[in-house]
Amino acid sequence: MRRVTRNGVLAVAASGALAVTMPAYAAFASDGAGAEGSAAGSPGLISGNTVQLPVDVPVDVCGNTVNVVGLLNPAAGNGCADSGEPGASYQAAGASGGTSGSATEATSGGAAAEGSGKDSPGVLSGNGVQLPVHLPVNVSGNSVNVVGIGNPAVGNESTNDSGDHPEPVRPPAEPEPSAPEEERAGPGPSAHAAPPREEVSLAHTGTDRTLPTLAGGAALVLGGTVLYRRFRPGSGD
């Protein structure tokens, strides 16, 4: 019976020591886990791939009391916070007595991953896998007693704030090359008045009056022939 009681006391005492020391290191959170990578200009088979697995698991255990036989050991006024804004952690003493732990507040940047794949031709290339995980856990202001009197747990607060993550900076787009001088469109022709056309005419040779002259000459020859045949000598008139 004594051995069982002794083992139980040792187990509870160890649990109490763990509850006291856990706020010193378990509640501490760093600036978060982040990963950044890029795959560019890696042609080939299964090349230029990026796998990122940032994990951020802040755990807060503060303001807890574990007592076998406890009297007036409150756990009150403790605060645990996980903030996404970057900053340094600080430790503040809690308003508790006995074996109560201290309150620790830390800031965390959360889990973030950023990757890019550009100009990576090939089979199964330029791919990216990102699995950011953020699992904040808060355990604060608890009181465990086997036999306890006046051990309240009040006024405790736990906060998880992921904060606003800044937008990733995108590289500027490359400007398109300008067209060569030969391909550039030149200025259009100016609208000048067309010069007047000169009328082309043939030289006057008198051929337009030849036809009436020929007709008159033919009439005269015909008339002379008729008169000659009529009045020729030896005719039977």
From Swiss-Prot:
Keyword terms of this UniProt record: Amyloid, Cell adhesion, Cell wall, Peptidoglycan-anchor, Repeat, Secreted, Signal
Leader peptide range in chain numbering: 1-26
Motif LPXTG sorting signal per UniProt: ranges: 202-206
Modified positions (Pentaglycyl murein peptidoglycan amidated threonine) in chain numbering: T205
Recorded phenotype for the gene knockout or disruption: A single chpB disruption has no phenotype; a quadruple chpA-chpC-chpD-chpH knockout has delayed aerial hyphae formation and sporulation. A quintuple chpA-chpB-chpC-chpD-chpH knockout has a longer delay in aerial hyphae formation and an almost complete lack of sporulation. The quintuple knockout still expresses ChpE, ChpF and ChpG. Quintuple knockout chpA-chpB-chpC-chpD-chpH has strongly delayed aerial hyphae formation, makes many fewer aerial hyphae but no effect on viability of the spores produced.
Gene name linked to the record: chpB
Family label: Belongs to the chaplin family. Long chaplin subfamily.
Protein's organism: Streptomyces coelicolor (strain ATCC BAA-471 / A3(2) / M145)
Cellular component aspect of the GO annotation: extracellular region
Summary of the function given for this chain in its UniProt record: One of 8 partially redundant surface-active proteins required for efficient formation of aerial mycelium; the short chaplins assemble into a hydrophobic, amyloidal fibrillar surface layer that envelopes and protects aerial hyphae and spores, presumably anchored to the long chaplins. Chaplins have an overlapping function with the surface-active SapB peptide; chaplins are essential on minimal medium while on rich medium both chaplins and SapB are required for efficient aerial hyphae formation.
Subcellular location: Secreted, Cell wall
One GO process term, biological-process aspect: cell adhesion
Pro residues bias spans: 169-178
Protein name per Swiss-Prot or TrEMBL: Chaplin-B
Membrane topology: Peptidoglycan-anchor
Induction summary: Transcribed during aerial hyphae formation on minimal medium, about 10- to 25-fold lower expression than the short chaplins. Weak expression in aerial hyphae (at protein level). Very low expression on rich medium, unaffected by ECF sigma factor BldN.
Sequence ranges assigned to domain Chaplin in this UniProt record: 42-82, 120-160
Keyword Secreted assigned: yes
Region Disordered, residue ranges: 81-127, 148-216
Cleaved propeptide residues: 206-237
Compositional bias segments (type: Low complexity): 101-115
